[in-house]
């Protein structure tokens, strides 16, 4: 299995910029980068009714889709756990 490319939706980039602390932003970025080598890490969940996956990073949730044929991960949303699924 090769390394996946990561594409981050523009709205997800804005959500990342809005994360309150620099340390949280750094950890979220590291978590997203780790998805390139392991798109389904321990602790990730497939969301029911959608072709999306979720990983937790502290109080934040990263929602993304995986296109195995293209070796592509598309980050859809980065949000605080209280508002991630709305």
PLM regions and their residue ranges:
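A short, surface-exposed loop/turn module that caps and links secondary-structure elements
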Residues: 30-55, 83-85
């Amino acid at each position: 299995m090769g390394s996946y490319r990561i594409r981050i939706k523009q709205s997800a980039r804005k959500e990342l910029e809005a994360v309150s602390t620099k340390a949280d932003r750094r950890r979220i970025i590291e978590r997203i980068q780790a998805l390139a080598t392991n798109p389904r890490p321990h602790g990730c969940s497939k969301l029911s009714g959608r072709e999306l996956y979720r990983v937790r990073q502290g109080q934040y949730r990263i929602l993304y889709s995986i296109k195995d044929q293209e070796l592509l991960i598309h980050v859809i949303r980065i949000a605080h756990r209280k508002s991630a699924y709305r």
